[in-house]
Amino acid sequence: MIEIEVFPHRFLKATTTEKFLNSAYSLETVQRVIMHGESLPQKVNYGPAKGTPVNHSERKLINVQGVEVQLTLQVGRFWILLDDETELSKIDEICKELFQYGYKVSEGRFIKDSPTVTDYMKYGESFVNNIDKRMLGVTDPRSRFENSVSLIPKSEKGE
């Protein structure tokens, strides 16, 4: 397994994020994509305008491989888990096509692969010991799982 980070030099619009995710998930070796960026809350969480709705133009529903995903952040980077390095050049081609303003692709270790103390505190020992290891590190411990994770099924060959 290889992990790469794709770091565009600008925050992405929802349409660009959708194009990138659909292109990335169309590759055979891509197992998981994690997005990072600035939060796009539904309402102001603090200050004098607390509770006021935030009508951000980029908080949209996007379609990734047929699954509707509510975009709750303005994406600034992607962590991608690949089976092997055979399609690294294809990811670079996708980036060149979509990110004309520049980007950086790094190979390294970005996704945690073992449970932390926070996982045990949040979910409990029995849950952590039985969870699919691919789900580790996917969600913020302060958030609700269903609000922060969207599962995109990988289509099999021949479909």
Swiss-Prot record:
InterPro entries: Me_CoM_Rdtase_D
GO biological process terms held by the UniProt record: methanogenesis
Keywords: Methanogenesis
Subunit annotation: MCR is composed of three subunits: alpha, beta, and gamma. The function of proteins C and D is not known.
Protein name as it appears in the record: Methyl-coenzyme M reductase operon protein D
